[in-house]
UniProtKB/Swiss-Prot annotation:
Residues 381-476 form the SH2 domain. Phosphorylated. Phosphorylation is induced by EGF. It comes from Bos taurus (Bovine). Transmembrane segments: none annotated. Pathway: Protein modification; protein ubiquitination. The keyword DNA-binding does not apply. The gene is SOCS5. Pfam families: SH2 (PF00017), SOCS (PF12610), SOCS_box (PF07525). Residues 115-175 are annotated as: Disordered. InterPro entries: SH2 (IPR000980), SH2_dom_sf (IPR036860), SOCS4/SOCS5_dom (IPR022252), SOCS5_SOCS (IPR037343), SOCS_box (IPR001496), SOCS_box-like_dom_sf (IPR036036). This is Suppressor of cytokine signaling 5.
Amino acid sequence: MDKVGKMWNNFKYRCQNLFGHEGGSRSENVDMNSNRCLSVKKKNISLGDSAPQQQSSPLRENVALQLGLSPSKNSSRRNQNCAAEIPQIVEISIEKDNDSCVTPGTRLARRDSYSRHAPWGGKKKHSCSTKTQSSLDTDKKFGRTRSGLQRRERRYGVSSVHDMDSVSSRTVGSRSLRQRLQDTVGLCFPMRTYSKQSKPLFSNKRKIHLSELMLEKCPFPAGSDLAQKWHLIKQHTAPVSPHSTFFDTFDPSLVSTEDEEDRLRERRRLSIEEGVDPPPNAQIHTFEATAQVNPLYKLGPKLAPGMTEVNGDSCAVPQANCDSEEDTTTLCLQSRRQKQRQVSGDSHAHVSRQGAWKVHTQIDYIHCLVPDLLQITGNPCYWGVMDRYEAEALLEGKPEGTFLLRDSAQEDYLFSVSFRRYNRSLHARIEQWNHNFSFDAHDPCVFHSSTVTGLLEHYKDPSSCMFFEPLLTISLNRTFPFSLQYICRAVICRCTTYDGIDGLPLPSMLQDFLKEYHYKQKVRVRWLEREPVKAK
């Protein structure tokens, strides 16, 4: 008995160091089970007949008795040292206490916790026999099927001050055990901690009704994200047409600068697609185009490059012979160079067999001569016909802001500027829309002028030039004079119009020479007919 007492004291000391506050409340259970084990060893009492009586006792006593004492059928188990069974008794009692203290939501996490896979738990479970494990499983099933009232009394019922102290000690002990396990596991199996204060009291998200988006004034509180993005919301919900009621009732003082710029860009985009109103007494030039349009393309006033184009009611001509002036310089049809429009007859027939559409489009536009061609010809910075590579060779090594004016290499544009900025040579083409010249016709906020020379004069001032715009402060003068023929053309174009050149008593070649520097302004687009092409 002295040897058993020493072993028990050693085991009790280790359990107190391991479980902290849980040792005081659970040592009583171990003492009770050890005393019963010793008394049964002396009296050699068999528990085979007392099994029905154990069902009426508490679940903890059943587990302790069945694990502390094995059946009497095996004589070797009857004389076995009961101190070897004490660790299993303590482990099972810990699990039962935890099951009775924690909530049902945390019971599953407890089964998967680190205590089930601890080294001491695995070794001491092997010391139990198969019969002991089976009896433990039956007791667990029996405990789950008990009535809810008894479980509630066992978990939450407090009959005396002693029971209250034991419940509080279990709570503190379980908390300390959780901290110990979390320190042991570390980052491998982090345990999530829930805090009620971390959750927001209310959510910032709210449902937005469609009627709120159609209001003229912002219904959201000032300073919120929706109030700051109100101009973007109205940009996608309000109509863009200038004839809508939104523009009539809208207060410009409530709109930011960015919103106004976006609205102007959208209005310019619509005017480019639809055309502008022609001036009074202007001669309208009609251009009818019949195109085999692939269904992949969008059917609109701007036809994609590579489509068949026909003037008037004439028959279709081969793509390689499309050299007329009407075909090569029309902006609205986006006709590029002849090599970009060449399509083989086989591919054209293949597109027709796939169910293409035959579109008849009538495009109305007016021809206008460059208003200040005489001033441009007399300007020393104008070099005439020149490509970008020749311009870069002339500007190499020149200071910041050096520029020259030249003819654009693209057929859809008349002039371009080459200039030095950021230690390199850059190029910008001069675009035209509605009889105004600028470096970006699609953006109405960019500076525009009715003449090309007026545009160059504006960008000579560095203070009025943005970082992404051309800087034209120092002109690179040309080293040769223009011929008398060029100068005479500039003088004649100043005194007449594009349509007035046809009334001059000049040969057709000279008339074409006088019409060279002109641009086309689209004024109206009408869809005449759209019918599917019959498959051949």
